[in-house]
C-alpha cells in the first residue's frame, strides 16, 4: 500500500504558492538608461525565490540588492570625474563634487518587490537619489554653468547655446576661502536672501547655492570683477557676480542644473575660443549682451569678433547689428568715466 501524501495537488496553499511563483517569474522589468536598456526577467528573478516556512514565497532581498548594485556600478556617474571641453578650447577633467546619476539602492529594492507583487511588466527608470541631464557621454549634457576659477570667468549654456558670460570674484585665497572645484547640481534658488557667517551678514537679491553654503549671487558692493581680485579681496567662497549677470543666470537655471567648477593649468588667462560663427549664432551673441555695464565687455567683444568673421552676404542678415554698435558706444562711454577700484569684500 502507499502512504497518502500530506499535501495533494489540489491543496489550496500549494496552488497559491505555485501561482505566486509563476506570477513573480513572469514579470519583466525593463530599465531605461537613455539609449541603453537593461532587462530583469524570470531567469534572474527565479534565483531569488524559495518556499518559506509558512508555505509562502520567500524573496531573498540580499540577492535583489546585489542585482541593484550591479546596475549602480554600471550606470552611476555621481562622484565620477567629468571631462569638459571648455569655452577656451581645451579639455579639462573636473574632479570632486556629487553631480550625476546615482541609484537609490534600498529604494530600488523596494520598487522591484512592489513590481513583482503587482505581477505586471513595467518599463521605467530606476529609483534615483540624484539625477543628471543626460545618459550620454557627458551626463551634464549641453546645459550647464562653466566656472573657470583661473580666469575668473563664467559661461552659462542652455541647450548648447551661450546665454550668459561674465567675470566674477571667487573665494579669497589669502584667507583660505578658496572656492572648491567639482561638478555640482544647483541645490535651489531664491530671491532676497541674507547670507550669514561668523563675521558677516550680507543681503543679496539672487541666491543660487550649489555646494553647501557655496553658491552664485549678486555682489552689488563690488565695482570690479575678474582678474586677480580673488587672491586677496575675494569672497568667503561664493561666486560674486555683477547684478545683471546674476539676474540672467537666476532666470535661466533651476534646481539640479549642472555647475562645473574647475581650474586650468597655469595662472594666466587664456583667450576664449570663438564659437563657429553663423548668422543665428551672431544674432544670439548680440541678443545676450543685454543692458550694458562694464562687465559686458567680453560679451560685446565676442559678438563683434563673430560678426567680423562673417561674409558680407551673411553680415547683411544680422538683423540686430544696430544693437551691437549701440552696445559698443555705451561701453566706451562707461569706460571713459570708470571710477577707481574700491573693491570691497
Task: Label each region the model flagged.
Residues 39-40, 201-202, 226-230, 295-300:
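Short, polar loop/linker segments at the starts of domains and inter-domain junctions
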Residues 43-50, 159, 225, 274, ...:
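Surface-exposed flexible segments
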Residues 113, 117, 200, 209, ...:
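Alpha-helix boundary recognition
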Amino acid at each position: 500500500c502507499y502512504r497518502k501524501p500530506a499535501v495533494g495537488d489540489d491543496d489550496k496553499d500549494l496552488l497559491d504558492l505555485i501561482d505566486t511563483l509563476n506570477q513573480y517569474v513572469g514579470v519583466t522589468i525593463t530599465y531605461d538608461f537613455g539609449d541603453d536598456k537593461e532587462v530583469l526577467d524570470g531567469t534572474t528573478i527565479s534565483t531569488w525565490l524559495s518556499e518559506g516556512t509558512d508555505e509562502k514565497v520567500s524573496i531573498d532581498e540580499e540577492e535583489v540588492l546585489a542585482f541593484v548594485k550591479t546596475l549602480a556600478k554600471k550606470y552611476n556617474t555621481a562622484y565620477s570625474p567629468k571631462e569638459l571641453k571648455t569655452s577656451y578650447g581645451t579639455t579639462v577633467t573636473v574632479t570632486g563634487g556629487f553631480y550625476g546619476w546615482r541609484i537609490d539602492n534600498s529604494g530600488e529594492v523596494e520598487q522591484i518587490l512592489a513590481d513583482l507583487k503587482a505581477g505586471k511588466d513595467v518599463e521605467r527608470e530606476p529609483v534615483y537619489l540624484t539625477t543628471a541631464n543626460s545618459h550620454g557621454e557627458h551626463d551634464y549634457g549641453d546645459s550647464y554653468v562653466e566656472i573657470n576659477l583661473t580666469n575668473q570667468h563664467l559661461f552659462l549654456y542652455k541647450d548648447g547655446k551661450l546665454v550668459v558670460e561674465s567675470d566674477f570674484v571667487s573665494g579669497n585665497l589669502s584667507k583660505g576661502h578658496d572656492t572648491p572645484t567639482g561638478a555640482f547640481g544647483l541645490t535651489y534658488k531664491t530671491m532676497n536672501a541674507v547670507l550669514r557667517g561668523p563675521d558677516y551678514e550680507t543681503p543679496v537679491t539672487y541666491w543660487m547655492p550649489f555646494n553647501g553654503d557655496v553658491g552664485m549671487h549678486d555682489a552689488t558692493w563690488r565695482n570690479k570683477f575678474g582678474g586677480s581680485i580673488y587672491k586677496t579681496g575675494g569672497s568667503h567662497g561664493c561666486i560674486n557676480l555683477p547684478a545683471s549677470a546674476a539676474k540672467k543666470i537666476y532666470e535661466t537655471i533651476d534646481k539640479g542644473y549642472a555647475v562645473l567648477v574647475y581650474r586650468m593649468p597655469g595662472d594666466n588667462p587664456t583667450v576664449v575660443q570663438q564659437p563657429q560663427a553663423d548668422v543665428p549664432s551672431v544674432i544670439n551673441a548680440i541678443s545676450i549682451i543685454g543692458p550694458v555695464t562694464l562687465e559686458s565687455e567680453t560679451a560685446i567683444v565676442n559678438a563683434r569678433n563673430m560678426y567680423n568673421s562673417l561674409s558680407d552676404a551673411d553680415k547683411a542678415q544680422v538683423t540686430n547689428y544696430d544693437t551691437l554698435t549701440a552696445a559698443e558706444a555705451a561701453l566706451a562711454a562707461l569706460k571713459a568715466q570708470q571710477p577707481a577700484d574700491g573693491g570691497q569684500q
